[in-house]
Each structure stands twice: as structure tokens, then as C-alpha cells.
Amino acid sequence: MDIPPLAGRTVAMSFCALPVSYLLNQVSAFSQPLFVVLTSALILGLLFLAVYSLSHGEITYDPLYAVFVIFSFTSVVDLVIALQEDGYMMGFMDFYTKEGEPYLRTAHGIFICYWDGTVHYLLYLTMAGAIRKRKRYRNLGLYWLGSFAMSILVFLPGNILGKYSSEMRPTFFLAILYMLVPCWAGVRIFNQSRAPTSYTPDMVQEEQKKSLLQRPADLALIVYLIFAALFTVFRGLVVLDCPTDACFIYIYQYEPYLRDPVAYPKLQMLMYLFYALPFYCLAAYALAFPGCSWLPDWALVFAGAIGQAQFSHMGASMHMRTPFTYRVPEDTWATFFLSNLLLALGPHLLAFRCLWRPAFFLHAALPSSPQDQDKKQQ
């Protein structure tokens, strides 16, 4: 997709986060958690009014435009937080990480901020530009939906269940409202019409007649999905304290981060066990049997979710904020990195396959009879 002309205006509004955060950081009143949450709500409200007044036509055409522009602002804030916590910036968001959301200072929180400040930010700019030019952005929206939902579903419960549960601030309840956004946005994105395809019914039937051996890419993906499902079950058993020797060796020698009391890694593995595992099985079925029209959409959602999850999990496992005893040992770093990288790349290859040649997943229409063709010609 080409870079839309609106990107410049959206970038300008989002980068207002830099002077705003710097000025707020200099005000001593923001050492109180209540002031932090009230100011955060006020800034978001003023930003919405500014977007509404400047881009009323775009919001009328698609209300998600306002969401993408506002979230591009928060993405810059998250990137500033991540860079500051890693020592690349100073004096911008100290007040927020101390009195707003201290759990953003964890390794997992830092990598969530990096993902939001880069991948999500680019998605917001592109989708806002697509709305401006009245173009489709359904595929990008589905990817963002999965990524955003996964980050929220792991991060918010992890804040409650982990060692930072005693440091909850009023800002946490403002973050809970974020859970409503993917629900509303997901309904709107799924209700958008799909991009038209050029496949005729005869082409669809011809593609769906092919056996699995005639589709080596699908066969390879099914093999991958089987191994990914087995690995997901294994890591789920590991975090559930399975007493077998294999689980004991794995959690101490390969992924000790799963024992970290911050609770994010354990919740991540449980999300995989209860949600990713069923998808692996259903996706393998959809690749073997034709006509599963749901797979292309959900493959995009799943790719976004796994991409965000694996980025945060892999980064936090090796970050300096993670205690040394919970970091990946140097002698098993290659095994850890390769296995988790494959787990992240596989869903993206599946989504690419579904978008590349979707005929296998379309509903096959019955071929028209000669009598019907004669009627059409008459």
C-alpha cells in the first residue's frame, strides 16, 4: 500500500506527545496518582476534540479514523517510555511510570511499548491514510485487532496477578477502557466488505479438487501447525508445574523466564494453550478440506496476536530488567531463539498463503447448467 498523504498530518499530531510529556514531567503535582489519571483522561479528550474538528468528514465516513489518530499519539508515548526505560531518553515520562503505570517498567512492559510504538504506530498511520483516501484497510485492521487484543489480554491480568499487584494505580482503570476498543473496532472491521476476487466458480472448483499432495505448501503448513500445537501443549504443561523431567529441564535450562513472578510469561503460555492450540487444530483442518472461508480473516488476527506475543516474550526473556536467574542461559540461547522465532513466523506464512491464493477457502458455487447459460444469452 502506498504511503497516504494524510500520514504527514497524523505524524504531526502524534508527535505532539513529545512536548506534552516533557512539560507534564516538569510539574511536581504529577507525583500524585490521581492527578496523573485525570490529566491523562483530559489530554485524550482534548485530542479527540481536535481530531473531530479537523477531520469531521473522515470520522463521519469511518469513526475508527479518530481511534487510529488518537492511538498514534499514545503509540509515540509508549515508544518514549520504552526508550526512556532503556536509557536512550531522559526527562519525559518519569512521572507516568512512577505514579501512573509502574508495571510498564518491567521487561514485558517495555517490549509491549516498543511494539506499540513501532508496529502499531505504522498500522495506525496506514489505516488512517486509507480512510482518508477511501481505500480498504480490512486486512491491516484484522492484524492490528489480533495484536492489540493479545497485548491487553496478557498485560492487564498480569498486572493484577503478578508481583506488581500491590502497586495498582487509578490509571489502571483507565487502561481497562482500552478493552472496549478492540471489541467495538473488531465488529466494525469484520463487517467491512472483503476485497473482491477474480476467481470464477470453475477456477474455485479446480483449485479445491487438488489433493493435499498436490499442494505442498499447504502440506508443509499442516506439518508446522502440528508441531506448533505439540510445542504449545508442552509449554502449557511447563507453566502448570508438570513434574516430568522434560518439563523440569526445559523451565530451568531453556526458558527460566516462565518462572518469573511477574506472571506475564505464565499468562502468555496459558493464552497459547487455551486459544492458540484450538486455532492450530482448526487451521490444519481448513488447509486439508476446502471451503473454510473463515480461515483467511482469522489467520490475519492470529498472526497479529502471535507476532505481538512472541516479540514481547522473546525480548523480555533476554532483557536486563529480567532478573539474571530468569533470563535465557547463554548456552541455550540459539535453541530458544530459533524455536520461538519459528513459532512467530509460522502464523504469518499461513496468513500470507491465505491471501496469496484464497480460492481453496472460497465457497464453491455450483456450475451453471446449459439451460441456464441459454437463458442468460437470451
Curated annotation (Swiss-Prot):
TM spans (from-to): 10-30, 34-54, 63-83, 110-130, 140-160, 170-190, 219-239, 269-289, 291-311, 332-352
Gene Ontology cellular-component annotations: endoplasmic reticulum membrane; endoplasmic reticulum-Golgi intermediate compartment membrane
Subcellular location: Endoplasmic reticulum membrane; Endoplasmic reticulum-Golgi intermediate compartment membrane
Protein name: Transmembrane 6 superfamily member 2
Organism: Mus musculus
Broad class of the protein's primary localization: endoplasmic reticulum
Example of a GO biological process term: regulation of lipid metabolic process
Residue span, EXPERA domain: 61-186, 217-351
Expression across tissues: Highly expressed in the liver at both the mRNA and protein levels.
Superkingdom of source: Eukaryota
Job description of the protein: Regulator of liver fat metabolism influencing triglyceride secretion and hepatic lipid droplet content. May function as sterol isomerase.
Similarity-based family: Belongs to the TM6SF family.
Keywords, alphabetical: Endoplasmic reticulum, Membrane, Repeat, Transmembrane, Transmembrane helix
Keyword Cell inner membrane part of the UniProt annotation: no
Annotated membrane topology: Multi-pass membrane protein
